[in-house]
């Protein structure tokens, strides 16, 4: 109802709970509402959010184009981006959850080729196959694109979300990690109503 939308709109304040991007960025599919998550496997807040993201994705409307971009700020982040894109290329999203668990609960930081190859081997991926995929042109292109996206959206911390090329949402004093998806949903509702 209009009343509940008005109440909801008061809960999340522009400039405090989310920011407008300086310039609107064209989305990859103008027919849908785009939501991009920027993350790093080594980020504790991203790990906290991972289970929530998994549940959130199960209930996404067909008008949402959700995709993820790993940050590539430093050598460990680049290795994790390679791991993410290799798992995605293999259609093995469960490796991402396992990587988060390895890093944050098992204290295996997955920054060496050997550690990452062992992780993929645990899922039945032969070391040679992982090497071929992770060093492929496709993966290198994805990592370069991730770097470009991170710069374009001025991602300085993760987790962060970009909603429909207009808004940036990130954890803050006012918005804890667990509430990020609520703010994203609020912005999606705004976009849907326009």
Q: For each of these PLM feature ranges, what is it?
A:
Residues 1-75, 151-152, 186-194:
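Extracytoplasmic thiol/disulfide redox context detector
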Residues 39-42, 57-60, 87-91, 103-107, ...:
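Sec/Tat-exported extracytoplasmic proteins
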Residues 41-45, 72-76, 102-106, 138-139, ...:
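Solvent-exposed loop/turn segments at secondary-structure junctions
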Residues 47-50, 77-81, 174-177:
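Conserved strand-to-helix beginnings and helix N-cap segments that scaffold or border functional pockets
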Residues 50-57, 80-84, 96, 113, ...:
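Extracytoplasmic/secreted envelope proteins and their assembly/folding machinery
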Residues 61-89, 96-121:
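Structural microenvironment flanking redox-active thiols in thiol-disulfide oxidoreductases
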Residues 94-95, 111, 129, 158:
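Alpha-helix N-cap and coil->helix boundary residues
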Residues 122-194:
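C-terminal cap of thioredoxin/glutaredoxin-like
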């Amino acid at each position: 109802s209009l009343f509940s939308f008005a109440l909801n709109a008061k809960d999340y304040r522009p400039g405090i709970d989310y920011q407008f991007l300086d310039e609107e960025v064209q989305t990859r599919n103008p027919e849908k509402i785009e939501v991009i998550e920027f993350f790093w496997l080594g980020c504790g807040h991203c790990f906290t959010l991972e289970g929530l993201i998994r549940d959130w994705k199960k209930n996404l409307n067909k008008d949402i184009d959700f995709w993820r971009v790993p940050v590539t700020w430093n050598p460990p982040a680049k290795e994790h981006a390679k791991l993410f894109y290799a798992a995605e290329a293999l259609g093995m999203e469960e490796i991402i959850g396992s990587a988060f668990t390895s890093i944050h609960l098992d204290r295996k930081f997955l920054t060496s080729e050997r550690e990452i190859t062992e992780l993929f081997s645990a899922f039945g991926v032969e070391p040679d196959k992982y090497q071929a995929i992770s060093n492929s042109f496709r993966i290198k292109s994805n990592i370069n694109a991730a770097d470009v996206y991170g710069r374009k959206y001025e991602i300085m911390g993760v987790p962060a979300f970009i909603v429909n090329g207009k808004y940036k949402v990130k954890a803050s004093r006012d918005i804890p990690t667990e509430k990020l998806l609520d703010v994203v949903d609020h912005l999606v509702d705004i976009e849907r109503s326009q």
